[in-house]
Amino acid sequence: MKEHMTMNVHALARPARSHIGGVGQGGTVALRSSTALHDPRWSKVEAALSALRASGRHAVRVVDAQCGAGSLLLHALHHARALGFTAIEGHGADGSPALIGRARAAANRCVDPAVGTQFEVADMITALRAEHDLPADIVICHWSAARNRPEVDVALHCAGRIIVDDDAGRQSFGAAA
């Protein structure tokens, strides 16, 4: 007689697009995000962080003006910690409350006291204008949002030193690291 086995497929773990892994060196929580690694902006973010660290910097501020669920920003902050930054601040903004909720939930799983995050529901212009008084080291955005919108371009110039966007043919602008 054959045994019949049933499985509740709804109880199976679902793979997350971005998840927090185990505790890494120095007590940090390792963020692994295949979404972030495949983002066309990741190599520019990685290079900017490396250049800032190589220049002797120990603190870094990163702003993602259209962060979605926050995977790229959170991955950048984790990478900054792995590079040896000791004070890391990330600010993400997006117009979708649902995506900001996901970003906040992911950020809450990172328990490293050297990494501070803030996510808010805001449009790109509002988020960038909030950075004018204390410009970020790196601002991440989608160039398509700024195309043909001079107010976005001006806000980007004032919001950060290094601008990272997804237009491969366009050079990042702002002051060099």
Where are these regions (language model features)?
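Class I SAM-dependent methyltransferase Rossmann-like catalytic core
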Residues: 8-55
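A general structural motif
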Residues: 57-59, 85-88, 135-136, 158-160
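Conserved class I S-adenosyl-L-methionine
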Residues: 58-68
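Class I SAM-dependent methyltransferase SAM/SAH-binding core
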Residues: 77-124
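Short conserved loop adjoining the S-adenosyl-L-methionine
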Residues: 126-133
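A short SAM/SAH-binding and catalytic strip from SAM-dependent methyltransferases
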Residues: 136-152
